[in-house]
Amino acid sequence: MIICMILVSRIAFFKDAEFLRAVRDTMGKNRMSLAHKREKPIKGIIWKKNLKKMNFLSINFKDYHVKDISDLEYFKNVETIILTYMGDNEEDIGMYNEEHILDNLNKVRDFNKLRRVQLYHLNADDSVKKECPKAMVFID
């Protein structure tokens, strides 16, 4: 029973199904990005220790309709976070209408290695910078 509890405590349980889909589709050795999308999604268990190895995380909400970014808490050693809403070409730009998408950005507040946060085409203002005091925050 104790061994089972220890094993379960090492598994990443995602609150947002689209965030999980993004991880399964784009997670590499130490980065998560659509630029390096996998041929086949990862199947099975996602271990917390593998997410801690990520130093770069990028999610395009045009492809993954994430509503809750609190799952960022698993990426404790990330250095760069890019959250964006963009299509394949420059004309295909809009604003992500998920009003509260950045409500849980405070999950990264104590990430010691976080140096850069880029937010593109999201409902964000300068108050977001308070959630990431150790990082340079770029909003467009």
Model-derived features: where do they sit?
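N-terminal capping/linker segments that flank leucine-rich repeat
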Residues: 1-140
